[in-house]
Amino acid sequence: MKSMFKLSALFVAMGITALGVAPVAQAATAPAEKATAVLVHGAFADGSSWDEIIPSLHAHDLKVVSVQNPLSSLADDVAATRRALDAQTGPVVLVGHSWGGMVITEVGNHSRVQSLVYVASFAPSVGQSINDLAKDYAKPSGLDHVVVDKEGFVTMSFEGISQHFAQDLPVAKHRLMTATQGAIRGAAFDEKVSVAAWATKPSWFIVSDQDRMIQPALQLDNAKKISATTIRVRAGHVPQLSTPKEVIKAILDAAKLNNE
């Protein structure tokens, strides 16, 4: 009996030891979660404006969310983007095109956001609106081709889309973009940001040298102000469609920062 008791005690001891080891194995560090690219479109557009780059981002094992902004106010677009950020579980590269730069500047202090990518965009300081940013630069030619409805919402004519917004894309794309564009409330261009997320988050900036909607000089000055990694492209206002490789690379570079 004593031998059996000793053997049982040995087995119990071994069991206790095994139980002690198991939690250590389970506590092994899990692989870092891949970043999600949250894409924020601009005025006169919708979430499909990112269609050219989304498959490549997926191919590089990034998750992607393309926000559908209501374009009814800065606050409404920030709320839509914040909901998308709240739904993520890992680090986020927050990307904004054109007016979307206002949105990511305001909401980019979200805890999930690790880096910002501005694409032919605005990067305001606290207390600045788009009209504040643009007042010291020549009026872009594209702004002569906007249509304002009786409720103050603004769209672009086909001529504006084809000759000034996306002059470096084929005519079939012009027709599609004109048909699917989002109308933005004109008063939004006077709305000011209360946060400048770029002050605390690493930033990238795609500057479009042939932009006819936002002066390239304004883009360059904004990129310099925020100390962004700056990439210049020979493109119109939608480089994510006309020169997608450069935009994809900037997003991937920002994502690598998250996964180091």
Label for each model-derived stretch:
Residues 1-11:
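Bacterial N-terminal signal peptides that target proteins for export
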Residues 9-20:
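Bacterial N-terminal signal peptides
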Residues 30-89:
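Active-site catalytic motif of lipid deacylating hydrolases and related acyltransferases
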Residues 95-100, 104:
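Gly/Ala-rich beta-loop-alpha elbow adjacent to hydrolase catalytic centers
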Residues 109-113, 117-158, 185-188:
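Flexible "cap/lid" loop of the alpha/beta hydrolase fold
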Residues 176-198:
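Active-site nucleophile elbow and catalytic-triad environment of alpha/beta-hydrolase enzymes
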Residues 205-207:
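Short beta-strand/loop motif that positions the catalytic acidic residue
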Residues 209-235, 241, 254:
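Conserved loop-alpha-helix segment in the C-terminal half of the alpha/beta-hydrolase fold
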